Amino acid sequence: MPRIALYPGSFDPVTNGHLDVVRRAVTLCDRLIVAIGVHPGKKPLFSTEERLAMVRDVFGPIAAEAGCAFDCTTYDNLTITAAQQAGATIMVRGLRDGTDLDYEMQIAGMNETMAPTVQTVFVPASVAVRPITATLVRQIAAMGGDVSAFVPPQVAALLKTKFAG
């Protein structure tokens, strides 16, 4: 039976922190599904279609190089429900610090109750990417700052275009 992992997030935008998680996640599974949460109450910087393209462009080659099948999708329900619908038995979550751990442990506990066959796997962020958040990247880019140290090159170009003029 193939090991299918779901890596959920908003990916608005994709950061080097996300990239760090994906590089390690593809070693844990046979198929990685990156799931973009779409929530009607949120107003993302990038459209759903733009985020899907970004995820495919950045993560697809990493999965291919690792010999891991790769898909990306969207969901607008509970993340654990999305994992079940995708046939995932692994939920991948990145951790930057203790605050992330406290929050993620609560969610993992609830998810385990709702779907005991889906195991949460925590991937600690590498030191170099620990301070990166998509929120901070958006703020820096919006104010004309250089985000090239925090995002893949193609994402830096998209952000520059998004905030041009």
From Swiss-Prot:
Q: Which GO terms describe its biological process?
A: coenzyme A biosynthetic process
Q: Which cofactor does it need?
A: Mg(2+)
Task: Give residues annotated as binding substrate.
Answer: 10, 42, 79, 93
What pathway annotation does it carry?
Answer: Cofactor biosynthesis; coenzyme A biosynthesis; CoA from (R)-pantothenate: step 4/5
Q: What is its main location?
A: cytoplasm
User: Entry's InterPro entries?
Assistant: Cyt_trans-like, PPAT, Rossmann-like_a/b/a_fold
Quote the EC number.
Answer: 2.7.7.3
Q: Binding residues for ATP, per the UniProt record?
A: 10-11, 18, 94-96, 104, 129-135
Record's keyword terms, sorted? ATP-binding, Coenzyme A biosynthesis, Cytoplasm, Magnesium, Nucleotide-binding, Nucleotidyltransferase, Transferase
GO MF term (any one): pantetheine-phosphate adenylyltransferase activity
GO CC list: cytoplasm
- Respond yes or no to whether keyword Transmembrane helix is given for this record: no
What catalytic activity is recorded?
(R)-4'-phosphopantetheine + ATP + H(+) = 3'-dephospho-CoA + diphosphate
Q: Where in the cell is it found?
A: Cytoplasm
Which residues are listed under the site Transition state stabilizer? 18
What is the role of the protein in this entry? Reversibly transfers an adenylyl group from ATP to 4'-phosphopantetheine, yielding dephospho-CoA (dPCoA) and pyrophosphate.
Family the UniProt entry places it in = Belongs to the bacterial CoaD family.
Q: Report quaternary structure and partners.
A: Homohexamer.
> Per its record, how is this protein called by name?
Phosphopantetheine adenylyltransferase
Provide the gene name from the record.
coaD
